[in-house]
């Protein structure tokens, strides 16, 4: 019976997974009320590892709400830096105050690209890292 409960608990955690990683802000920081979206998507520089670390520093030390988007496998949903055609959750850019992007050679579908275009056309700030 216990293994069955463990399996059900694990399946439930996968079913409720988000399309992105959200790190809550430290309420006392200078970035209070501001949101940063960090976009990770390259196979060479391992931004899927470094962006969450940067997001945690920005959230916990400086008080920004941070969301990290990842290049993911379209079917299974796991983080896949080699997948150049899928970054889920790009609609969160509509509420971002800053975008930090570390991607290379992405070919996203129009639905995922449109939030990038809206963000850039709004004249909001971008930091690109490599």
Q: Where are the language model's segments positioned?
A:
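Active-site-flanking alpha-helical
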Residues: 9, 129-130
């Amino acid at each position: 019976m216990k293994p069955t409960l463990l399996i059900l608990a694990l399946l439930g955690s996968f079913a409720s997974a988000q399309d992105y990683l959200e790190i809550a802000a430290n309420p006392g920081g200078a970035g209070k009320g501001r949101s940063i979206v960090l976009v990770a998507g390259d196979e060479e520089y391992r931004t899927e590892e470094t962006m969450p670390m940067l997001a945690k520093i920005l959230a916990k030390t400086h008080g920004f709400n941070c969301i990290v988007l990842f290049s993911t496998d379209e079917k299974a949903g796991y983080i896949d830096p080699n997948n150049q055609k899928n970054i889920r959750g790009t609609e969160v850019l509509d509420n971002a105050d800053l975008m930090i992007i570390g991607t290379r050679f992405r070919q996203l579908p129009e639905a995922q690209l449109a939030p990038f275009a809206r963000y850039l056309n709004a004249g909001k700030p971008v930091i690109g890292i490599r």
